A protein has these predicted regions:
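Functionally constrained cores in energy, signaling, and assembly domains
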Residues: 12, 29-32, 39-41, 45, ...
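Charge-enriched, short contiguous segments at helix-coil
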Residues: 87-147
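Amphipathic alpha-helical interface elements
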Residues: 1-80, 139-147
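Short, mixed-charge amphipathic alpha-helical segments
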Residues: 3-7, 71-105
Length: 147
């Protein structure tokens, strides 16, 4: 992952490493939670880069549910997509929202006492799309610092 996204945060890597340990131990709900937290941290990195580039404040000082932060970001991000390099615009919705939402659903199902089971295949699916998500997010972040 560090070769695909050299700027990935240490915190995101820590959660991914914990997710791997959980997966190897057959703790698939815990895997989903760790991957979800990692995905959220990665998305927050994107928001922080956006804040810096466009001099906007999206992440509040006090706690606010992540979904509210993400919704606010999306409102500001959508009109700025035109500023991105052409190659990053392709399949952006599927990458930023689709993959993030897939991983988030596993986290939400697992992180609350719903009784919903996460199968090995579901956890593996999240692991399989995570590198693409990470790579694309950090390409966007890199494009912000290169302009």
């Amino acid at each position: 992952l560090k070769t695909r996204a050299s700027g990935i945060s240490g915190l995101a890597i820590e959660y991914i490493q914990e997710a791997i340990l959980c997966f190897r131990g057959g703790a698939y709900r815990a895997t989903a939670v760790m991957l979800g937290v990692s995905s959220e941290e990665i998305f927050l990195d994107l928001i922080r880069a956006f804040e810096s580039k466009y001099n906007k404040k999206i992440i509040p000082e006090k706690y606010k549910p992540f979904q509210q932060i993400k919704d606010e970001f999306n409102k500001l991000f959508d009109p700025k997509k035109v500023d991105l390099p052409q190659g990053l615009k392709n399949n952006m919705e599927q990458t930023l929202n689709g993959i993030h939402d897939l991983i988030k659903k596993g986290r939400d199902d697992s992180g609350h006492p719903t009784g919903i089971e996460i199968t090995r295949d579901e956890a593996l699916a999240s692991f399989s799309v995570l590198p693409l998500y990470i790579e694309r997010v950090y390409q966007i972040i890199d494009s912000y610092s290169n302009k």
